[in-house]
C-alpha cells in the first residue's frame, strides 16, 4: 500500500520542515519513504509544496503521483495547484479560516483546524505547521505521533535543537485538537 501526502503553503510556514519530519517518522516506523519539495525563489512568502510518499513496499523512483491521499494546506495559494491530484475521499487538513473549504473537492474529509490561532494562543506563532502536522497524524494515523516527536532531534538542525520541546507541544496540541473535535478519519492510513 502506498500513501501520498502533499503539504502546501508559503515560504516561512515550515512546509519543507514538516514534510521532512513526516518522512523521517515514516522511516523510523519501517516504511519506504520518498519526499520531494518545490519552492519559489523567495525565502519568505513564495509558494512552498512538498509531497511525502510512504509505502509498505518499494517505491518506484521517481514516483508519479497522479492522486494524493491527504493534503495539509497552510495557505490558500497552494490549494488550486493540488486540486487536480485530489481523489474522492481525500483527507484535507487546512489552516482555518485562512484556507477556506475548497468548493470542488467532493467527498473530502475536511479537518479545519485553526492552526495559526492555536499557535498564537500557545505563544508559539511559528508553530502552526507543527500543529497542523499533529492534526494530520491524529486524523489519519499515517505515522505515529511518538515517531514524529522522536524524529525531531534528527530533523532539526543543531541551532534549532533548543526548540524541540516547543515543537513537541505544538504537535501534541494539533493531535489533541482532532481528538477534542472528533474529526479523525473513518479509516486509518494502513488499514
Residue spans of the language-model regions?
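Active-site cofactor/cluster-binding pocket
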Residues: 1-191
Amino acid at each position: 500500500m502506498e500513501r501520498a501526502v502533499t503539504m502546501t503553503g508559503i515560504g516561512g510556514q515550515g512546509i519543507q520542515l514538516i514534510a521532512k519530519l513526516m518522512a523521517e517518522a515514516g522511516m523510523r516506523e519501517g516504511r519506504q519513504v520518498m519526499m520531494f519539495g518545490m519552492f519559489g525563489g523567495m525565502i519568505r512568502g513564495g509558494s512552498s509544496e512538498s509531497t511525502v510518499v510512504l509505502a509498505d513496499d518499494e517505491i518506484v523512483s521517481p514516483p508519479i503521483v497522479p492522486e494524493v491521499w491527504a493534503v495539509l494546506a497552510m495557505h490558500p495559494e497552494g490549494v488550486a495547484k493540488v486540486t487536480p491530484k485530489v481523489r474522492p475521499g481525500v483527507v484535507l487538513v487546512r489552516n482555518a479560516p485562512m484556507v477556506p473549504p475548497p468548493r470542488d473537492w467532493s467527498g473530502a474529509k475536511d479537518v479545519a483546524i485553526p492552526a495559526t490561532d492555536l499557535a498564537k494562543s500557545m505563544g508559539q506563532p511559528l508553530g502552526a505547521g507543527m500543529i497542523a502536522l499533529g492534526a494530520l497524524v491524529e486524523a489519519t494515523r499515517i505515522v505515529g505521533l511518538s515517531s514524529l516527536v522522536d524524529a525531531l532531534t534528527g530533523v532539526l538542525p543543531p541551532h534549532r535543537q533548543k526548540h524541540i520541546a516547543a515543537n513537541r507541544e505544538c504537535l501534541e496540541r494539533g493531535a489533541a485538537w482532532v481528538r477534542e473535535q472528533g474529526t479523525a478519519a473513518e479509516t486509518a492510513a494502513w488499514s
